[in-house]
Structure formats: C-alpha cells, structure tokens
A protein has these predicted regions:
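A structural signal for multi-pass alpha-helical bundles of membrane permease subunits
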Residues: 31-353, 358-361
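Short, Lys/Arg-rich, polar N-terminal cytosolic tail immediately upstream
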Residues: 2-33
Length: 361
C-alpha cells in the first residue's frame, strides 16, 4: 500500500479530545445553596435583633427570679438580688407580700400588687373594644379609599393624618377636648366628667385610641384590597351578585390574610397600651384606666426592678399567647407560608388516598 505523507497528520488532527466532567446540580443542592445564601444575608440582622431584643428579654427573665431590696430579718442587713424563685410572680398573681419578719401573707391595701387584676381586666377590655371598633372603621375606610373617584389620593392622605400624629400629642389634644370647659362638653350642652368618672374616662381613652389607630388598620386592609383582581368583581356583577354578596363572598375571604395580620398587630399593640391613659387621665396605678404597663413603670419608680421584671415577663407571656392563637388558629399568616402549608396538606391527603386505594385493590 502506498504511503501517504499527509495521512498521519490528518489522523492526528482528527484525534478526539477527552470529554470533561460537567457538574450537574440537583434540586436539593440548589435548595441548600439558596438557603445558605439567604442565611448569610439575614445573619447580620438576626445578630442585631438578638442583641437589641433577645438580651433584654433574657435579662428581664433573670431579674424576675431575684428578690427586691429588703431587710433580711435574720441578719438585719439589706439584701438584694438573692434568688427568690416564684416570689415575684406570686406577688402579682396572688397578691402575696413578704413582711419585715419574713412572713408571706396577703398584701395590705395600698400596695401596687393589689391593682394587678383590675389592671389586667382594663387592659383586656381596652384591647377587645378598641381592636373591634378599629377593625370595623378600618374596613369601611379601606373600602372608601379603594374606590375609583376623583380626589382619591387626597382622601387617602387626609385619612392617614391621625395615625401620623405622635401619641403624646394625640393624648394632649383629646385631653383638652374632654376638659370640663372643652369642646366636647360644649357640643353636648352638658357637663360630663370625662377625666374623673371611671366610665367616661375609659370611654375617652377608647375614643382617642380609635381615632388615632383606625387609619393604621385601614392602611393594612387597603393593601389587601388592592391585591384582589378587578376581574373577579366584574364576573360577579355579570352573574348578578349584589353588593353585599360581593363583599361577603369575594372581599372578606380574599382580604382575610391582610385583615388577620392587621388585627394581630393592633391586638399586640393594645395589650401594651401606656401613654394614652397616662397622659389623658392619670399615671396612678389605681386609676380607673390603669393598664398593666402602668404598673410596670410605677413599680420601677419605686425601685422594685425585680418585681417589675416579673410583671414584664407576664405581659410578654400574655402577648405571646395571644399571638400564637391568632397565628395558629385564626389564620394570621405573617410568613406568607399558609398557602404552602395548605398545598402540602393536600399532597399528603392525596398520597394517603392513593395508598388506601392500592391497599384496597
């Protein structure tokens, strides 16, 4: 066979290269990578929150198990910070005080602990009434602001003015209006003791709080209303649905997530009410409008930081319990995961039904 000089060079040029390995990322690997990047981004914020929020909570809980400054009957020396167990909690819940001789008995009249349960009832009363009224008014205001008409932007700006005013300014404003010679009594044509009569004092605080915070509820509900497609309402009108049917069958179900979040925020805020009753009515712990937060401040003013920490811990537990109920049982979806959880439940139910069918077959 004749030798071809270019055959070798051609064969060498046609030599196949060795294939390189290509890394293929699985969905699990991509998911882990995404979670890792997200954790790295939010880690600084979590560290700051742990310092600013976590440490004070832990410190308050530690102080709540330590005794206040008092005279030790066995040594005759003032002691403070000794481990007291549940003494500070029983001081508030059962109104149990320790005498100078070390005997624990019922607190005498005038001790701030005797105002605990009345303050709890007033706090819960304020929270329930104000949140209910603010939710109703907020829904009405949100529906008005969500309409299509001229001057809608001006109406939205005007509605939010009360919420933008500082709470202290709001309290002084309504205090002047509810004064004996104020504009409210002038309009009513009678003399009502708004700041001294227990019933009217509580009514005054409720009116001021609803006036200030209803726009906040309206703003959150409006955000939910704007997420509802207009096509849904148009289809309902074509089908002959009345305005009430559109509200109950379309608006309320679709706006429920935003509504429950708004109720959650307002309830937690109402349970910590302090400045309105203090500025408008009185800062005394036996005031007809005294809240639990007022007792904390009053106890701290008397130098009882450990028992005040115990009361703060009780407030924290109350707020945590309310938040858990609203999130777990009433559908307040803060993390936006309710839809995913429902989808997982449906998948589990479908898989279980399929397994049952296979077993039956």
């Amino acid at each position: 066979m004749p030798h071809c000089p270019g055959a070798r060079s051609a064969s060498s040029s046609l030599k196949l290269e060795r294939p390189t390995a290509v890394a293929i990322s699985t969905p699990q690997a991509l998911k882990r990578k995404t979670y890792g990047q997200a954790a790295g981004l939010i880690a600084p914020a979590l560290i700051v929150l742990a310092i600013v929020i976590g440490y004070p909570i832990v410190r308050a809980i530690m102080l709540s198990f330590q005794g206040n400054r008092r005279l030790d009957p066995s040594t005759g020396v003032f002691v403070e910070g000794q481990f007291a167990g549940l003494e500070n909690y029983l001081y508030w819940i059962n109104n149990r005080c320790m005498s100078g001789t070390g005997v624990v008995s019922a607190c005498p009249p005038g001790v701030i602990a005797t105002d605990f349960w009345p303050a709890v009832r007033i706090t819960i009363f304020f929270a329930v009434v104000t949140v209910l009224l603010e939710t109703i008014l907020g829904m009405i205001m949100a529906l008005i602001m969500n309409g299509e008409y001229k001057g809608r932007g001006l109406v939205r700006a005007a509605v939010l003015v009360p919420w933008a005013i500082p709470t202290a300014v709001t309290a002084k404003l309504w205090q002047f209006m509810f004064a004996p010679q104020g504009i409210v009594n002038s309009l009513l044509g009678t003399h009502v003791a708004w700041t001294t009569d227990p019933f009217y004092a509580r009514l005054a605080v409720i009116i001021a709080d609803v006036w200030k915070t209803a726009p906040f509820m309206a703003l959150l509900i409006l955000a939910g209303l704007q997420m509802i497609p207009r096509d849904v309402y148009e289809a309902a009108r074509v089908d002959g649905a009345t305005a009430w049917q559109r509200f109950t069958k379309i608006t309320l179900p679709l706006v429920k997530p935003a509504l429950m979040v708004a109720i959650l925020f307002r309830t937690l805020d109402a349970l910590r009410m302090y400045d309105l009753p203090v500025i408008m009515i009185s800062s005394s712990s036996n005031s007809p409008t005294a809240t639990v937060s007022q007792l904390v401040v009053e106890d701290m003013r008397q130098g009882n930081f450990n028992s005040a920490s115990a009361l703060s811990t009780l407030i924290f537990l109350l707020i945590f319990a309310v938040a858990f109920i609203l999130i777990r049982f009433l559908g307040a979806d803060l993390g936006g995961t309710a839809e995913k959880r429902a989808q997982r439940r449906q998948e589990k139910a479908a898989k279980k039904a399929q397994n049952n069918q296979e077993v039956a077959a």
